[in-house]
Amino acid sequence: MIHHISAEYLTVDRVREILENNIKIDLSEDAKKRIVRCREYLDNKMETQKEPIYGITTGFGSLCNISIDKDQLSQLQKNLVMSHACGTGERVPAEIVKLMLLLKIQSLSYGNSGVQLETVQRLVDFFNNDVLPVVFQQGSLGASGDLAPLANMCLPLLGLGEVEYKGARRPSDEVLKEFGWKPISLQSKEGLALLNGTQFMSAFGVYSLIKARRLSEWADLIGAMSLDAFDGRINPFIDEVHEIRAHKGQLTTARNFRRLLEGSELIARPKKHVQDPYSFRCIPQVHGASKDTIDYVGSVLETEINSPTDNPTIFPEKDIIVSAGNFH
């Protein structure tokens, strides 16, 4: 089974399926066309436009007014990656690094970043073959994108840095040679496209969200079993109670409890006590608030992982290259 990277909305549930089932990925034909079209547009634009383009024909940050000679553009992008690969601290877990690769590929696939198709395809190769760059947890604020962790993630594209492959930490150039992969020669804009972005924080966010959803499911299961064992009442879980308050998660929790306890002889039998303790009666309100929070976080993260987040942003159809702040 193969998941095709495309403009189709990528859900957190689909991300979970890809990771848990070790599903391979590939670029859809439409994604390939968008990537190639954007790169060709950028190359043509650089031949005809005399005005400087930030980070493409200029330096970075405070050096934005310094023009870069054409024969130095590739070296500029390579230098950018190497200079920012300064992460420290504990290593990022392998499953998070793999998720970072997936999200970076998705972000680059929209055709607004100006990268070479070859560059994105190599990231796909890394993902599919579990060639996972060594990335560190500290070194970046995220205020200008996840610069340091993404730089460490992208070093192996150049044959630099280290990767984890088959359980061993190895120099990336050795592993590239085993696969017959040549180091990528970055073209103008590519270093920025790879480093600018939110895939490090998004990967941790998505991973945490997947865990939170699972914990929420378990909380309902444990709560239902506890209510049944306590010989509790199902009355606090009827729809009428929760429809008048209209919090979605609260109603969802109540219905889930009734579903889980359907057919239970204990829950259906007459009760001697008038009401249950707070800890049982308020489960829909407490679990429901958690569900609503998880849903909100999910909506934010899904918007983020379905967006290009580098800078400058390229719009080939409108003949626009704009320096903005979607990396923040």
PLM regions: where:
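N- or domain-start disorder-to-order transition segments that initiate the globular core
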Residues: 1-50
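Hydrophobic alpha-helical scaffolding
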Residues: 5, 28-31, 66, 86, ...
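Short alpha-helical scaffolding segments that buttress acidic/His motifs in well-ordered protein cores
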Residues: 15, 80, 84, 96, ...
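FAD-binding core of FAD-dependent oxidoreductases
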Residues: 54-68, 72-76, 83-108, 136-158, ...
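Alpha/propeptide regions of enzymes that mature by internal proteolysis
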Residues: 91, 114-115, 217, 299-300, ...
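FAD-binding glycine-rich core of flavoenzymes that anchor FAD
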Residues: 112-138
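Mobile "lid/hinge" segments at catalytic clefts and subdomain interfaces of large enzymes
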Residues: 149-257, 262
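Accessory "access/gating" subregions that flank catalytic or transport cores
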Residues: 227-328
